Amino acid sequence: MRVTLVVLLALFLALQYRLWFGKNSLPDYWRLQQEVSNQKNTNENLERRNQLIYADIEDLREGEDALEERARNELGMVKKDEVFFRLVPDRNP
């Protein structure tokens, strides 16, 4: 009986060691759960960003107003016989 108890205790301790310190232990599992959570957050942020970009692309494909606005703001284009004034803020207030 005593030998069986010692063997069972040794087996229990060996399993506990593997559970806490071995390969694929609980701390590894918790770390991987955190990494998965972080990756899900990153994916959600990128998905929102992609949706905004797709909406912008669709707006540019369908509407002339968005295309004209982008040409004016980003490229500085103006219509024929139009004068465009851009006010630049003073760097030293």
UniProtKB/Swiss-Prot annotation:
GO terms for cellular component: cell division site; cell septum; plasma membrane. It comes from the Bacteria. It is found in: Cell inner membrane. One of its GO terms (biological process) is FtsZ-dependent cytokinesis. Its main location: membrane. Signal peptide: none annotated. The keyword Cytoplasm does not apply. InterPro entries: Cell_div_FtsB (IPR023081), FtsL/DivIC (IPR007060). Residues 1-3 are cytoplasmic. It is a single-pass type II membrane protein. Essential cell division protein. May link together the upstream cell division proteins, which are predominantly cytoplasmic, with the downstream cell division proteins, which are predominantly periplasmic. Belongs to the FtsB family. This is Cell division protein FtsB. It comes from Idiomarina loihiensis (strain ATCC BAA-735 / DSM 15497 / L2-TR). The lineage of its organism: Bacteria, Pseudomonadati, Pseudomonadota, Gammaproteobacteria, Alteromonadales.
